[in-house]
Amino acid sequence: MPGPLRVLITGAAGQIAYNLSNMVANGNLFGKDQKIILHLLDIPEAKTVLEGVVMELQDCAFTVLEGIVPTHCLKEAFTDIDVALMVGAMPRKQGMERRDLLSSNVKIFKDQGEALEKYAKKTVKVLVVGNPANTNCLIMSKYAPSIPKENFTALSRLDHNRAIYQVAAKVGVPSECVKNVCIWGNHSNKQFPDLAHAVVTKGGKQHPAKELINDEKWVKEVFTPCVQNRGAAVIGLRKLSSAASAAKAIVDQMHDWWFGTKEGEWVSMSVYSTGEHYGAPKDIYFSFPVTIKNGHYKVVDGLAMDEWGKGLFKITADELVDEREVALSSFK
């Protein structure tokens, strides 16, 4: 049996982490044969809540959970970690857009990037969840320069899963029968959810999703804004941001990054853009369709896009460049 993995969850006293820590500790992410040591980081003001989270994890008597390190100290949190699930950030509240969070969160991710650089394993895999996730991921990577930019990703699997559900519901199949939707760009209401290449298994056969749907108006006026604004819709109803669905998406994205994607299937993941794919700008974290093998992702190239799609692609790309400039200017 391999040695234990040290897995950091930040914002560990929060609602996403409350769901996520249980999913990781019960073996959903790395399997039932992989021992885990959970590093749980939150601010000192959350100390008593975090103690309660630790008690619950202990009381679950998970067989793969070998140890728990609750802390508000960056050194203790980041030392020798194999995986970082960066959930903690200033929360988004009703009426706020992710851009509004930039000034509050860039300093958090600068400090945590420096801690990652100083204390974590150089092979660490980092998944940034706290919003605005793509730009927080970029800031963190810039302050951990010895860790490859390919080792950082931002969460776009929640949007991917939302898109899959909408397609499945429209054509009347379970979600598992839909694959190869794409989320392009930012995790924001300017993302481009794309079903042009999605495939649906129905009646024992595979069909292009667009053929089964056969309703361009629905794609443009229902599906696209629904996925773009789903997070805000959840906040409007719960008065809190998505928690269980976000935790499930974190597990999905890291699981596929760790173990690989299925043959003939891609997933959406926000990865470092070198400017080589689809004309996306350099030096941002941009959601692309990717395949993954042996822990390494590869962007799926050659997918066609119509003029309407190209327009949405440009909007989300421009937003990410704008976010980057705002974030970097706060350090000047």
UniProtKB/Swiss-Prot annotation:
Positions of NAD(+) binding: 11-17, 42, 105, 112, 129-131
What InterPro entries does UniProt report for this protein, alphabetically? L-lactate/malate_DH, Lactate/malate_DH_C, Lactate/malate_DH_N, Lactate_DH/Glyco_Ohase_4_C, Malate_DH_NAD-dep_euk, Malate_DH_type2, NAD(P)-bd_dom_sf
The active site of this protein is located at: 187
GO CC list:
cytoplasm
Q: Name one Pfam family in it.
A: Ldh_1_N
Entry keyword set: Cytoplasm, NAD, Oxidoreductase, Tricarboxylic acid cycle
The keyword Repeat is assigned to this record: no
Q: Which domain of life is it from?
A: Eukaryota
Q: What is its EC number?
A: 1.1.1.37
The UniProt entry, under SUPFAM superfamilies, shows: LDH C-terminal domain-like, NAD(P)-binding Rossmann-fold domains
Which residues are substrate-binding? 92, 98, 131, 162
Family stated for the protein in its record: Belongs to the LDH/MDH superfamily. MDH type 2 family.
Q: Which NCBIfam families match?
A: MalateDH-SF1 (TIGR01759), MDH_euk_cyt (TIGR01758), PRK05442.1 (NF003916)
This chain belongs to the protein called: Malate dehydrogenase, cytoplasmic
- Which species does this protein come from? Taenia solium (Pork tapeworm)
